[in-house]
Amino acid sequence: MAEHRSMDGRMEAATRGGSHLQAAAQTPPRPGPPSAPPPPPKEGHQEGLVELPASFRELLTFFCTNATIHGAIRLVCSRGNRLKTTSWGLLSLGALVALCWQLGLLFERHWHRPVLMAVSVHSERKLLPLVTLCDGNPRRPSPVLRHLELLDEFARENIDSLYNVNLSQGRAALSAPVPRHEPPFHLDREIRLQRLSHSGSRVRVGFRLCNSTGGDCFYRGYTSGVAAVQDWCHFHYVDILALLPAAWEDSHGSQDGHFVLSCSYDGLDCQARQFRTFHHPTYGSCYTVDGVWTAQRPGITHGVGLVLRVEQQPHLPLLSTLAGIRVMVHGRNHTPFLGHHSFSVRPGTEATISIREDEVHRLGSPYGHCTAGAEGVEVELLHNTSYTRQACLVSCFQQLMVETCSCGYYLHPLPAGAEYCSSARHPAWGHCFYRLYQDLETHRLPCTSRCPRPCRESAFKLSTGTSRWPSAKSAGWTLATLGEQGLPRQSHRQRSSLAKINIVYQELNYRSVEEAPVYSVPQLLSAMGSLCSLWFGASVLSLLELLELLLDASALTLVLGGRRLRRAWFSWPRASPASGASSIKPEASQMPTPAGGTSDDPEPSGPHLPRVMLPGVLAGVSAEESWAGPQPLETLDT
């Protein structure tokens, strides 16, 4: 019994000593019954604003267990079976690689900015487009008439020397009177037609152009002799026309009779104010039908009908070989470029031109290169009309011509302060012009990139049907009726001097062709969501879960890193060789120092634990890590 009581006394003393040590090392507990059971976790545990797991393993386990991404739970549910865990890990890794690969392909296509064409059909009343008609008879301007006759004689000499064709028979000598104010001109006879080389069985014919010093020569060759003669003659013809005064206008209405014999629209006669006239140096007298007519119904009876007079005047037989009418359909307020988009109608026929209109809507940057008007284009338009790409290309070429050759081409408008090219003022302009024109044909000039297509454009698709007109049975009275308006009386010439043209809408329906991006932002997000759902069954919320995992991992890395730094900092005095074994201090006011003093000493000496008060949570950590666990109890018992 005595031993039992002695043992009980020792245990009570040890208990009191342990309680005393705990009271010295920890904050005193809140007042309350010491024997009360701990409260339930839900009621007693107060959740913090942000809670982190204790390790990365716990973090990853929590994510795989609760994430909405398919396959993630398989990485932790079969932890006891390493084969399944490894297999599902490899499958998840392969799915991730496939997802990244397909997303890369998707983004690559998106950055190429592909577009698709959406075609829709609309039906509404449409204004008839403009129609330009030319008779194909270029005139000889009176101020340079004698120069043109010199050109005719020089052309006959060249053709005779090449093809042994005598064109001088039946022609009188120079008969044009010398005008009072004839501009000085010297025909350059060094630029003549010649055989350049033999290309197989074909003979190339052309002419040579040299620069002002004669050191650099350019050969303009053709496989067709007709094309060579026409281009050579056209070069000299434009060279002569450049001598005309800037204010000179050709009186192209001097022809006998009228070009337009009759005109009607929807059964009503046209008015004279509905025509605009001008003269083209190559295609002769031209008329533009400029009536504001709205097509009510399709068909010939509801379109424009024209009866035209066709004359074959021998003004420039080598320059113009056309026997008929030149026709071009173009948009309103657009310049007619007859050399690019026109076609011919032969005499003695009735041609029905059916128009079908398409509206094209193009996408601008970054999907394409188009412009809404002339404001955003680098090239200044020289034509006083709406923006078209052809007008921009012509203006760009003319400006480059002025910059490179110091003069402009006669068939195009001039920039401010420039003058037209002529051998009298610019002897080597032909060499410079054809060099530049060859670069334009081979797309080596910057005009193609400087002149984008319009973002909104109307394209006209034409279909033409022809028949003999007038017919054999109706020729008598038809020609007799029209003969009163200046046609020749000979019946064999009447048919070849007439042509009838009908301009109608094939249908009032028109197609609208609109460009749309293949991958707009909503479509790109939809494609990305489809791929994520295919490989992982993921959604936007699943991506937010991944983002949360990354944030938690970053925060846990910072916390664990800070804890390691604190441990290393507090363990540094223990690693000091002068510090002795750690002893337990029963009370904070009686803690001995290595020098034999107490904790009441103001400044303890020697390499021992410094007395540092840390704020916040770090103070508790430092106090907790400064004690040596259960070892003080054993020390007191001894």
Swiss-Prot record:
Keywords: Cell membrane, Glycoprotein, Ion channel, Ion transport, Membrane, Sodium, Sodium channel, Sodium transport, Transmembrane, Transmembrane helix, Transport. Originally identified and characterized by its inhibition by the diuretic drug amiloride. Residues 1-47, 574-613 are annotated as: Disordered. Residues 1-86, 552-638 are cytoplasmic. The keyword Amino-acid biosynthesis does not apply. Its main location: membrane. It is found in: Apical cell membrane. One of its GO terms (molecular function) is ligand-gated sodium channel activity. It catalyses: Na(+)(in) = Na(+)(out). It is a multi-pass membrane protein. One of its GO terms (cellular component) is plasma membrane. Disulfide bonds: none annotated. Glycans are attached at residues 166, 384. The chain crosses the membrane at residues 87-107, 531-551. One of its GO terms (biological process) is sodium ion transmembrane transport. It holds the Pfam family ASC. Residues 28-41 have a biased composition (Pro residues). Residues 108-530 are extracellular. Residues 1-13 have a biased composition (Basic and acidic residues). Belongs to the amiloride-sensitive sodium channel (TC 1.A.6) family. SCNN1D subfamily. Potential alternative pore-forming subunit of the epithelial sodium channel (ENaC), capable of replacing the alpha/SCNN1A subunit, creating a more active channel with distinct properties. ENaC functions in epithelial tissues, where it facilitates the electrodiffusion of sodium ions from the extracellular fluid through the apical membrane of cells, with water following osmotically, regulating sodium balance and fluid homeostasis. This subunit could also function independently as a sodium channel or assemble into other tissue-specific heterotrimeric sodium channels. Can form an alternative heterotrimeric epithelial sodium channel (ENaC), composed of a delta (SCNN1D), beta (SCNN1B), and gamma (SCNN1G) subunit, where the delta (SCNN1D) subunit replaces the alpha (SCNN1A) subunit. The additional delta/SCNN1D subunit exists only in some organisms. NCBIfam families: ENaC. This is Epithelial sodium channel subunit delta. It comes from Pan troglodytes.
